[in-house]
Amino acid sequence: MNEDEIQIPKVGEKYYHFKHDPLLGADNHLYEIVGLGDDTETGKIVVIYRPVYESKYLTEKGAEYFVRPLSVFLDFVDREEYKGPRFYKA
């Protein structure tokens, strides 16, 4: 995917994280976009998203949402076991 094809996530859209394993169910690592925000410390746009599945990680922290810089959300992963977008539209 090149820069011209990059789609900014929109509220309500659902994305899979690259760690999604369809064998573990359709909701495994599935997230819904809650909104975009402004990181007042850096001035960068962030993506606010929530898991569609029950996240023990967030529950233990007492949080409801994940937040990532837009650039990281749209980034590509380059690992031995996976090369591709960090998140992809469901």
Where are these regions (language model features)?
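Short aromatic-glycine motifs in intrinsically disordered, low-complexity regions
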Residues: 10-25
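Basic/aromatic-rich interaction segments and small domains that mediate binding to polyanionic partners
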Residues: 35-70
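Intrinsically disordered, low-complexity, charged/polar segments
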Residues: 58-90
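Short beta-strand-centered aromatic/proline hotspots
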Residues: 25-38
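Residues that flank catalytic or metal-binding motifs in active/ligand-binding sites
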Residues: 11, 29, 45
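Mixed-charge, Lys/Arg-rich low-complexity intrinsically disordered regions
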Residues: 1-11
